[in-house]
Amino acid sequence: KRVKEAKPEACIDGVHLQSQIAQGQEVIVGMVRDPQFGALMMFGSGGVEVEGLKDVAFALAPLTQAEAEKMIRKTWAGRKLKGFRNIPAADEESVIDVLIKLSWLAFENESIEEIEINPLRVLSTGAVAVDVRMRLKGEKP
């Protein structure tokens, strides 16, 4: 009603509603395909911190549970998942699960050149991909 009053010429075809995501820690999870080594997985500080902190770890896909845990432990973002000062602990197991599944997706699908989930919001239970970007073979970066 208010739209019609404010902008009578506006044409609204539909509305897309999304639930508000709870506060959580933001990390980046991704993959880039190296011509020599194949799928290279990435984990680190996400959101706006990714450019400033350069807090990332890399490992070749596919990842095992132990390799995913090791990647996470190498970073400040990983240590923060355990909780730090006024930052509550977040669900590290969900991040491990995302890393492993994403690594197998990349390993089994060579047409995927890049995947970036930034941020992956890690909650006290679970994680939500807030923004995802994927580039396939042949697409320009």
What is the meaning of each model-derived region?
Residues 1-141:
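ATP-dependent carboxylate/acyl-activation modules
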